[in-house]
Amino acid sequence: MAKESNIVHRYFKKKFDRATILVKVNPFIFKGMEITLPDEGEPEIRELTFDETIWEDLKMDGFEESSPLEFNLYYSGLAK
């Protein structure tokens, strides 16, 4: 299995009325993170564990593939 640092994660995004959700998924071990960006207030970061159906779930929920740069800017606190 590939080392954690060698994994190319997949990133997704969905805009809601009052927030945006960014998701990062490790496609090998199905773990990742979710950043909730409310229009007002502080971002919330959660670590998540997924299963093999995550791709269908994200598609059904209206998430679209997005940029790793955007996710990592919010995760590092450089974007607000």
Residue ranges with predicted function:
Residues 4-34:
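N-terminal acidic leader/helix
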Residues 7-10, 18, 40, 52, ...:
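Short linear motifs in intrinsically disordered/low-complexity regions
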Residues 28-58:
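Acidic, low-complexity, intrinsically disordered interaction modules
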Residues 58-80:
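Short, compact, well-ordered microdomains
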